[in-house]
Amino acid sequence: MLKVGITGGIGVGKTYISNLLEKMGYPVFYSDIIAKEIVSKDSRLISLIKQEFGDDIYLADNKIDNKLLSSIVFNDNNRLSKLNSLIHPFVFECFNEWCEKQSSRIVFKEAAILFESNSHLNLEKVICITASKNSRIQRIIKRDGRSL
């Protein structure tokens, strides 16, 4: 099975390309979506995150408190790296299990931080999507319903 990564910065069109590939019949693993799911569903990961960031990082319904987490990690690269080091092994595990269930000769893995997480080491090829800064800004504004 050929494993191909899809990566690039925010607003470059990773999801657009991934959706096209899916429409063509190729399986696509969406790393960011899986990461968001498992931080609220995998009890092993929840325990590790609570150990590192405290019980208050989770709300009553086992949903992560994104505002609190953001205030901690996005002002401290060491804490962000620690969070990523906790989450990425679980995403790798999910990807490997997902691959075992695929019958396609080619699968794709979309990940915004493919290289930073060392995910590329488990892939045969990587496609890096790019776009101009202006295009990216316009896409993000449209996608998020924001204005400048």
Go through the PLM ranges and name each one:
Residues 9, 21:
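P-loop (Walker A) phosphate-binding loop of NTP-binding proteins
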Residues 22-31, 43-44:
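Post-Walker A helix-loop "phosphate-sensing" segment adjacent to the P-loop in P-loop NTPases
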